[in-house]
């Protein structure tokens, strides 16, 4: 199938959040499965610093009374064709720039639609988040082009109809929706980034005021878990960790723990229970729970704790003050560093992720990949990727709790701390986690089924994953 991904982000050249990871990784795997997948992205001012872009455009268009150009390149590290939408509005050297985002991304979406109508005609346009929400509305006029809309962040829903009416053409049947809701209504298929979150957003607690619409279109709504790049994030070959290891050589992993303790200033003790946390310091990630109970947990146990991340100033200050109370046992790094994050995944015994809500989550999959046992709240994608440890039946991959309460988190962490004492059982738990398949190939198979369902096509024959992953 001919498929065009239209998005505001694409790793590794333009990434702010998880959407960039999806758009940067999924197309290259789908191409190896036989699809002709291409990406349509804004031509940001910083892109020439990150990749080679031909000087001359391949096409010139007109949208919303504006001239624009389209340049063709290749997404670095892949064979995925990349179309770059050129307009002065995207010259600033950052992806999101505040007050003019509604206008910029409506123009971008309109330009993508014109490109598909007049230059390269895909069978499916795969739209991502509110930035591209008008495309399914406009494509409703083109029955030979279908649309898939992926919700990465339901909280941001884009401009409303009254604003869109002033700057572009809106069909009368769009009613009063914002761009997110319009896309949900008019796309041929809608998905979010985990099955559990797809169910949760149909409720008032998670639906961000459009739960009624999401329930109404539930027949075309599904959830597909994101993947991680298992070639880049591989403890057997990771050059950023002190000692490489596999599930069969877990004894080597201890060297990473000692190296991490030395690097972040913790007391060097391979028997200490070391919890890691790599996160944005915001309420969504459960920081209010952590602040309420971490002092009690550190006082009650002999555990160690290391935090890496940035976010709200309040949470940064609170975590910094907590760390000062436990020198040698707690370290806080208020920054983001990919190499250090890998060393935390590889050196920690457990990984804390008590999210208030979590559409998918990547960190818990990274932790499992590197043998760190997740401690998570059962919500969204965490339900779909981490199962509760059952020592009797030798099942599960982590420690889970349900209620968003400090005592529930404290109890769950105590269980993990106590479980760490039983080293043979803990190693089996690590092996189960490391054996989980979080590759993009697994996600790509689900998207392939989704695309085929639009046209009533049968599922594709099984392709050997090793042939695809070997070339990622």
From Swiss-Prot:
Record EC number: 2.4.1.21
Binding site for ADP-alpha-D-glucose: 15
Pfam families linked: Glyco_transf_5, Glycos_transf_1
Keywords: Glycogen biosynthesis, Glycosyltransferase, Transferase
Keyword flag Repeat: no
InterPro entries: Glyco_trans_1, GS/SS, Starch_synth_cat_dom
MF term (GO), any: alpha-1,4-glucan glucosyltransferase (UDP-glucose donor) activity
Pathway: Glycan biosynthesis; glycogen biosynthesis
EC class of the enzyme, as a word: transferase
Swiss-Prot/TrEMBL catalytic activity: [(1->4)-alpha-D-glucosyl](n) + ADP-alpha-D-glucose = [(1->4)-alpha-D-glucosyl](n+1) + ADP + H(+)
GO biological process, one term: glycogen biosynthetic process
Known role: Synthesizes alpha-1,4-glucan chains using ADP-glucose.
Family: Belongs to the glycosyltransferase 1 family. Bacterial/plant glycogen synthase subfamily.
Annotated protein name in UniProt: Glycogen synthase 2
Organism per entry: Trichormus variabilis (strain ATCC 29413 / PCC 7937) (Anabaena variabilis)
Gene name for this UniProt entry: glgA2
């Amino acid at each position: 199938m001919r498929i065009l991904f239209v998005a505001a982000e694409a790793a590794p050249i333009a990434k702010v959040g998880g959407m960039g990871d999806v758009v940067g990784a999924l197309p290259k795997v789908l191409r190896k499965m036989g699809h002709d997948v291409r990406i349509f992205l804004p031509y940001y001012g910083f892109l020439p610093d990150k990749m080679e872009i031909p000087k001359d455009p391949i096409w010139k268009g007109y949208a919303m009374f504006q001239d624009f150009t389209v340049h063709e390149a290749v997404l670095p590290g892949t064979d995925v064709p990349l179309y770059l939408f050129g307009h002065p509005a995207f010259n600033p050297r950052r992806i999101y720039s505040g007050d003019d985002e509604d206008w910029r991304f409506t123009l971008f979406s309109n330009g993508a639609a014109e490109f598909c109508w007049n230059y390269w005609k895909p069978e499916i346009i795969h739209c991502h988040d509110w930035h591209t929400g008008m495309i399914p509305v406009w494509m409703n006029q083109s029955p030979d082009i279908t649309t898939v809309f992926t919700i990465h962040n339901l909280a941001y829903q884009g401009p409303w109809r009254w604003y869109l009416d002033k700057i572009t053409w809106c069909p009368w049947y769009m009613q009063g929706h914002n761009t997110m809701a319009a896309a949900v209504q008019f796309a041929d298929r809608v998905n979010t980034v985990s099955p559990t979150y797809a169910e949760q957003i149909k409720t008032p607690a998670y639906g961000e005021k459009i739960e009624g619409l999401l329930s109404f279109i539930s027949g075309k709504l599904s959830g597909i878990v994101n993947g991680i790049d298992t070639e880049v994030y591989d403890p057997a070959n990771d050059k950023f960790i002190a000692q490489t290891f596999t599930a069969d050589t877990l004894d080597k992993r201890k060297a990473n723990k000692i190296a991490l303790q030395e690097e972040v200033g913790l007391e060097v003790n391979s028997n200490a229970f070391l919890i890691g946390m790599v996160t944005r310091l915001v309420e969504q990630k459960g920081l209010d729970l952590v602040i309420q109970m971490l002092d009690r947990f550190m006082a009650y146990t002999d555990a160690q704790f290391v935090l890496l991340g940035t976010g709200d100033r309040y949470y940064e200050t609170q975590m910094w003050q907590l760390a000062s109370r436990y020198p040698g046992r707690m370290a806080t790094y208020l920054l983001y560093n990919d190499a250090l994050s890998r060393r935390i995944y590889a050196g920690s015994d457990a990984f804390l992720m008590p999210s208030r809500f979590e559409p998918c989550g990547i960190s818990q999959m990274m932790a499992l990949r590197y043998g760190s046992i997740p401690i998570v709240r059962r919500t969204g994608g965490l339900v779909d990727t981490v199962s509760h440890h059952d020592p009797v039946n030798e099942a599960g991959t982590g420690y889970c709790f349900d209620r968003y309460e400090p005592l529930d988190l404290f109890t769950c962490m105590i269980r993990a701390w106590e479980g760490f004492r039983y080293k043979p059982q803990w190693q089996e738990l690590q092996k189960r986690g490391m054996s989980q398949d979080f590759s993009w190939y697994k996600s790509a198979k689900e998207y392939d089924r989704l695309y085929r369902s639009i046209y009533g096509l049968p599922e594709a024959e099984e392709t050997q994953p090793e042939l695809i992953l070997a070339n990622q």
